[in-house]
Design a protein with these regions (language model features):
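C-terminal helical "tail/cap" subdomain of flavin- and related membrane-associated enzymes
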Residues: 323-410
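FAD/FMN-dependent oxidoreductases across multiple families
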Residues: 137, 153, 236-321, 327
Length: 410
């Protein structure tokens, strides 16, 4: 049996970020993952500006190595397609200047990101990184946990569970059952040779009437590839009996804005499905000697479906909470509340606003009316750009009176 201060379960973005942050303060850890790396991971492959921001905060040198090794494509905005085929190009940052502004976003295969982060951990952790290692059971003791794995037992004073949407960590309290409204289902595949991609690599979100409050996406990738997919809330999928793969194929074949662009494109492999645990304030993410991070903590953005940026942030915050625990020699429930409070302070407002936006998308007629009024409105692109940099502006967009004034050009 090996002993350590922190056992991190899961070597995805949340787990590896936690490991790298712990290492900066010389906190001993072991990190385990059931997979070998590099591994395929179902994802949209789009990374918001949160990703370079938090990696730079951890280490500017790591961000430089990421750009050098993974060669991510810089993405500068979003092309929204609303019901009625109204198209709006919205830059992440208006009048972007590379010398003044940070990288607004990336697209890169998740397989490459995860492998890079694991390599960074391997360089500092060596044999403390245990891949192809399955957690069999976890037993809570007075001074921590005994984790029984396929590679032997680990004794740890704390656990950070970053094992994803399929997390089986049994916390010592009853978890609420996952709600269909707090879960999204998604299908994605890869294509080569899709025509008409934006020259500044805008990602494309199609809010089509028959799939609201979900969307169809086209995300450009390096080497002439594109990540194509569709994501819809689980309760809507169940109620309407939606076959996601079939709907995705129907859009590619028949949508007038999409179909011509795929005429000479080649699909690479079969579609793959995944489950996205959306932000849920009822979900408890910390307690005596443990924390949940990333998808295990239900931190996927309810509007955009982004999970990687929030996973990295939560891994960073979990590590700093663990550092505080060892500095103060406190691991009790009351002390661990600080982790959830910091997560809510950093991510909670954004999650709440995204949830309310997603609720608005349930009403196709209203969305279509807004899109029609917004078409050609010179104020809309700038206003929507501000959504990505200013949460107060995003909150304003939930005010019907404010929306009406903008749409009426007042």
């Amino acid at each position: 049996m090996q002993s350590t201060s922190v056992c991190i379960i899961g070597a995805g973005p949340g787990g590896t970020m936690a490991a790298l942050r712990l290492a900066k303060d010389n906190i001993p850890f072991v990190i385990v993952d059931k997979d070998e790396f590099p591994r395929e991971k179902i994802c949209g492959d789009a990374l918001s500006g949160k990703v370079p921001h938090i990696i730079r905060r951890l280490s500017p040198e790591i961000l430089e190595r990421f750009e050098e090794k993974c060669k991510p494509m810089h993405s500068f905005g979003i092309r929204f397609i609303a019901p009625g085929n109204y198209v709006f190009d919205v830059p992440f940052i208006e009048n972007y200047n590379a010398e003044k502004h940070p990288v607004p976003g990336y697209t890169v295969k998740r397989k490459l990101l995860d492998a890079f982060m694991v390599e960074e951990v391997s360089n500092i952790a060596g044999e403390k990184l245990m891949t192809a290692c399955t957690v069999m059971s976890i037993e809570k003791g007075e001074d921590g946990f005994i984790i029984d794995t396929s590679s032997g037992q680990i004794q740890a004073k704390m656990i950070i569970d970053a094992s994803g949407a399929a997390s089986s960590f049994k916390a010592p309290y009853p978890k609420p059952e996952p709600e269909p409204k707090k879960t999204a289902l998604a299908v994605r595949t890869y294509y080569k040779g899709v025509k008409g991609l934006h020259p500044e690599n805008f990602i494309e979100l199609y809010f089509l009437e028959n799939i609201l409050p979900g969307y169809f996406w086209i995300f450009p990738l390096p080497d002439g590839l594109a990540n194509i997919g569709i994501g819809i809330r689980k309760d809507v999928v169940l109620k309407k009996k939606i076959n996601l793969s079939a709907v995705m194929d129907e859009i590619i074949r028949n949508n007038p804005l999409v179909s011509p662009r795929f005429r000479d494109a080649e699909r690479l492999g079969k579609p793959a499905a995944c489950r996205l645990p959306l932000g849920n304030p009822r979900f408890r993410i910390a307690g005596e000697r443990y924390m949940l991070a990333g998808d295990a903590a239900h931190l996927v953005d309810p509007l955009t479906g982004e999970g990687v940026g929030n996973a990295l942030y939560s891994g960073f915050i979990a590590a700093e909470q663990a550092i505080d625990c060892f500095n103060e020699n406190r691991f009790d429930d009351a002390f661990m509340l600080a982790y959830g409070q910091r997560i809510r302070r950093v991510l909670g407002k954004e999650m709440s606003i995204s949830t309310n936006f997603q609720k608005m998308l349930k009403y196709p007629r209203m969305v279509k009316w807004i899109a029609k009024r917004a078409d050609g409105n010179k104020h809309i692109p700038g206003l929507m750009s501000s959504m990505f940099t200013d949460l107060d502006h995003r909150k304003k967009l939930l005010n019907p009176i404010f929306i009406l004034r903008v749409l009426m050009n007042r």
